[in-house]
């Protein structure tokens, strides 16, 4: 009964949730039915709290649909069912029970660390000073779990997204958290080009065996911008074997890229396939509230009072990435220090006038319409027409939502630009896209791709 009921729940959840979300939160759960109580076991407190907070109502609803009023009561606990049941239809390749991997990793604590391994993570990047929002919530949660259970939670963890969105911050945060938990952990952070350089140097010095031993004896290997392996066949060959060795040893691998693994050109298919063995999570451009929070956090760190209206003014006009936001605020702070003037909207307009002018020039409604039409391979005239077929209506709604997000035009102005539509039509389109971004991985991916294109 347990296997049958929970398997049906799993099948429903796998159909309804994005694959990354399902793999991260639902797949690790184990189920046990006793005395008309269905107990779901989570591997740790973090997962338990998240699942109970985010999925309790959804799972209860599925159970009620399947069993009616006589369905079992749902409860949560931490631990492992003695005989795990009910796996998802397509379990992650290479996955193993979390508790076994955790014990394996922790058993290395008594091993004498090799003296030539020196952690090079930046201690200034932590989970505590990473500003969380809807755009990066899943990535941060995955990174946090990996830090708590290296080699066991998600291996490899693959984070992808545009420049300046926080991927590197999370890499360092994981490394620092692992080191804090296990002082002698061998954690190596590097850019992919450094791996290539080290390998070339090892080949030149006839020291390839030392190179292999070094990289295959770490507890956690954190590699940034893996797309730079493209067209470097010898480096890919060596990393392929290093990857396999680390995975077999339950040693953690975290990779980042500016694009989804399968979209990385010039990288062998066997590597791209392995990149997806664990968990792949996107980091999206930050939404308005997160951009404001980032600015306020940065101002606090610099002991600068940033009025709310100023933070919103900057955040509404600079949308592409965190690095751009922080750079703009640094310029505002520097100008305020040099001139002794108060930070207000007029002052910010002056301090950032070239940056704001460039942003407004880059992102126009006309530019958005052309970009969306090209992205979906439809005619611009159709996008602006009265046609209601889904192949045209959905891109039109996306374009309207992007215009509201990326420009300072009012809803009536946006409606006029889309063939004289009412502002209520634009508002409906924006709300519909927000809903679809929660429900459809494809829509969420398209929206993020378009924002990256328009903001680059």
UniProtKB/Swiss-Prot annotation:
Tree of life domain: Bacteria
GO cellular component: cytoplasm; plasma membrane
Residues reported in the UniProt entry to bind ATP: 164, 166-168
GO aspect biological process, one term: regulation of DNA replication
Assembly information from the UniProt record: Oligomerizes as a right-handed, spiral filament on DNA at oriC.
Record-stated family: Belongs to the DnaA family.
Annotated stretches, region: Domain I, interacts with DnaA modulators: 1-83
InterPro entries assigned: AAA+_ATPase (IPR003593), Chromosome_initiator_DnaA (IPR001957), Chromosome_initiator_DnaA-like (IPR020591), Chromosome_initiator_DnaA_CS (IPR018312), DnaA_C (IPR013159), DnaA_dom (IPR013317), DnaA_N_dom (IPR024633), DnaA_N_sf (IPR038454)
Location in the cell: Cytoplasm
CDD domains with a match to the protein in the record: AAA, Bac_DnaA_C
Residue ranges, annotated region (Domain IV, binds dsDNA): 337-456
UniProt main location, coarse: cytoplasm
GO function terms (MF aspect): ATP binding; ATP hydrolysis activity; DNA replication origin binding; lipid binding
Biological function: Plays an essential role in the initiation and regulation of chromosomal replication. ATP-DnaA binds to the origin of replication (oriC) to initiate formation of the DNA replication initiation complex once per cell cycle. Binds the DnaA box (a 9 base pair repeat at the origin) and separates the double-stranded (ds)DNA. Forms a right-handed helical filament on oriC DNA; dsDNA binds to the exterior of the filament while single-stranded (ss)DNA is stabiized in the filament's interior.
Spans annotated as Domain II: 83-119
HAMAP family attached to this UniProt entry: DnaA_bact
Record key words, sorted: ATP-binding, Cytoplasm, DNA replication, DNA-binding, Lipid-binding, Nucleotide-binding
Region (Domain III, AAA+ region): 120-336
Protein name: Chromosomal replication initiator protein DnaA
Description of its domains: Domain I is involved in oligomerization and binding regulators, domain II is flexibile and of varying length in different bacteria, domain III forms the AAA+ region, while domain IV binds dsDNA.
